[in-house]
Design a protein with these regions (language model features):
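Conserved AMP-binding A3 loop
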Residues: 45-49, 178-204
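Conserved ATP-dependent adenylate/AMP-binding module captured primarily in the ANL superfamily
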Residues: 87, 102-135, 203-222, 252-266, ...
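Conserved C-terminal "lid"/linker of ANL adenylate-forming enzymes
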Residues: 489, 544, 548-606
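Conserved pre-ATP/AMP-binding loop-to-beta segment of ANL
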Residues: 30-33, 158-182, 189, 214-220
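Conserved ATP-binding/catalytic segment of the ANL
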Residues: 400-466
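Conserved AMP-binding/adenylation subdomain of ANL enzymes
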Residues: 201-220, 227-335, 345
Length: 606
């Protein structure tokens, strides 16, 4: 097994900072459509020239308000076009962007501001303005119309000369700080990672070099992930640099509806969105009394996806006649409708921010929408590895991007060195153990195959050491259970215990649908009202019997010592605003287990 793999050399480029990406597009394609704004009448196009002019006007306002080169600007807003303006305008003025997740608690907002000391803040709406003001932010301006809105900020800078903006634009070099991005904090407190201009432009160039079939001038994408997350901002910069049209949609409930209007060719998604799309197909089939037929179609799609994967490196591979006929039949009946649901133009999806179930990856490839899996962290400026078209392997997160090296330490930890790796943190203490021999320690466990493809096996901090000394990585078991549409999150527990048990956090909407369709209406009252902080226990016999199936399947796939002997089913707040869920919908494991400790104890006392 390989211990190290490197991507190709990064192609030479002349970009010194992130604003050079925009300046280059203004020079080469000023009238090309860079952004689309969703309106009731349709999409309102914004050219590269128009975006650049708006950014420069906003930069003048920031300068007029006293922003100096190197000063920090906090941005707290949902994903929207004005976020992109704020990002580039701050850099044009010589500032450093500090994103604040719009779902942050008051304590988190206060901690972010105290740790990074921004001199000015840009808020999405009144609720974000109030959150920033209450946390002590100075000079707060809002993106929504109001007395201190972006129009007023722009107006304040009318006397700032164009030459001053251009002078400041050229100040930052590759080693200068561009943004301070907080980690998601799934297992520990958030850390404020420094991302330089060199990190940003290097990763943008690497992405364009690695995926020219995906990132190009004729491509269109919807950005629905939080722009406070480095993955979404990296995509936005890559799209801007390559000429890809970007449309923002900050309301997750409207993303599927945006497909028909925007008709994207590519999207970065989280696995939960893919599951929702598949579930939409199931729901429509059930409504048409075709549920069993759709289940057969799902099986066919997965089999077809596996065939396509095998055929990548074996030109002689042929599907069975039965599979080919079944796929053609279900394509007419279901698959083309699912593609139409996504706008009927999607060529590629990139899944990031959380592990993707291989079966789900095969399903989407089987319906004609291949999924590229990638891997990265805040500290690697998002992608460090990724699968390539022509070499899609479900369960793998691909080979290193150009300019990046992956090493596997003796204990299995994934180490990263390369163009996107952070130089450190705002609090130097956070970086004391972050590097070894020039490589960043990711905290993830993984392995490399002979072709240099990386597989992630779990988090070091999530390892469970049982009373017998057995080390158990919980992620494989948890991933198997969450294949059930009823389960939003599964958590294996058993640190210093004689055996393992599990907590299943259910999806209330999925449970509601199951209850209505399975003839168990007495489950519905159990879902009413807001659950307590530690979750509400659901002990309905039929529901528990239904949940036992995915638990049994997961147990069958692991050794006896890694099996859960009992489980508890809970409903809790699992939206992005939950204190237990990150903005990218990953579970904050330690915080949740602490809140659910009473439920866990019952698994060992009964």
């Amino acid at each position: 097994m390989r211990r190290e793999a490197s991507g190709p050399e990064l192609a030479d480029h002349t970009f010194r900072n992130a604003t050079d990406l925009l300046a280059d597009r203004v020079h080469t394609a000023p009238d090309h459509v860079a952004f689309g704004l969703r309106t009731d009448e349709g999409l309102l196009d914004v050219s590269t020239r128009g975006f650049d002019a708006a950014c420069r006007d906003l930069a003048k306002g920031l300068i007029a308000q006293g922003l100096q080169p190197g000063d920090r600007v906090a941005v707290m807003a949902p994903t929207r076009y004005a976020w992109a303006l704020a990002d580039l305008a701050t850099w044009l003025a010589g500032g450093v962007v500090v994103p604040v997740y719009e779902t942050s608690s008051p304590d988190q907002v206060a901690a972010t501001l105290a740790g990074t000391t921004p001199v000015l803040a840009l808020a999405g709406g009144p609720e974000h303005r109030d959150a920033l003001t209450d946390a002590g932010a100075a000079s707060v301006w809002t993106m929504d119309a109001g007395s201190r809105d972006l129009a007023a900020l722009v107006a304040s800078g009318r006397e700032v000369p164009d030459a001053e903006v251009e002078r400041r634009r050229r100040l930052a070099g590759p080693d200068d700080l561009a943004t301070i991005v907080h980690t998601s904090g799934t297992t520990a407190r958030q850390k404020a990672a420094h991302i330089t201009h060199g990190n940003l432009v290097g990763v943008v160039q690497a992405v364009r070099q690695a995926w020219p079939e995906v990132v190009h001038e004729d491509a269109v994408t919807i950005i629905a992930l939080p722009l406070a997350h480095i993955l979404a901002r990296g995509l936005q910069l890559a799209a801007l640099g390559a000429g890809m049209k970007v449309v923002h949609e900050g309301d997750r409930t409207r993303v599927v509806g945006a497909f028909a209007q925007v008709r994207p060719t590519f999207m970065v998604v989280v696995p939960q969105l893919l599951e929702k799309i598949r579930q939409a197909g199931r729901d429509r089939a059930n409504d048409a009394r075709l549920g069993p037929v759709f289940r057969a179609a799902e099986t066919t799609a997965v089999a077809w996806g596996r065939h396509l994967e095998a055929a990548q490196h074996d030109p002689a591979a042929r599907p069975t006649r039965r599979l080919a006929l079944a796929h053609a039949f279900f394509d007419r009946l279901f698959f083309r409708r699912l593609r139409r649901l996504m706008g009927d133009r999607v060529e590629w999806l990139l899944s990031g921010a959380a592990p993707l179930d291989p079966t789900l990856a095969h399903f989407f490839r089987g319906i004609g929408v291949p999924v590229i899996e990638g891997y990265g962290l805040t500290e690697t400026t998002a992608p460090a590895t990724g699968l390539r078209p022509g070499d899609l392997r479900a369960g793998s997160v691909g080979t290193p991007i150009p300019g990046t090296t992956i090493r596997i330490a003796d204990d299995g930890e994934v180490l990263v060195r390369g163009v996107g790796v952070t130089p450190g943190y705002e609090d130097a203490r956070d970086g004391e153990d972050a590097f070894v021999d020039g490589f960043f320690r990711t905290g993830d466990l993984g392995s490399l195959d002979e072709a240099g493809r990386l597989r992630i096996h779990g988090r070091r901090k999530n390892l469970i050491v049982t009373a017998s000394g057995k080390n158990v990585a919980p992620e494989p078991w948890e991933a198997a259970v969450t294949r059930s549409p009823l389960v939003a999150h599964a958590v294996l527990v058993g640190e210093a215990r004689s055996h393992l048990t599990a907590v299943l956090l259910l999806d209330p909407d999925a449970v509601r649908r199951w209850a209505e369709r399975s003839g168990n209406p007495d489950v519905l009252p159990l879902l009413a009202g807001d659950p307590p902080p530690g979750g509400r226990r659901l002990d309905h016999p039929a529901l528990l019997a239904r949940l036992q199936r995915p638990v049994d399947r997961a147990n069958a796939a692991v050794s006896r010592a890694e099996q859960a002997r009992a489980f508890v089913a809970l409903v809790a707040d699992t939206t992005a605003s939950s204190p237990f869920v990150t903005p990218t919908l990953k579970l904050q494991r330690d915080a949740f287990l602490s809140a659910a400790s009473t439920h866990i104890e019952t698994l060992y006392t009964t």
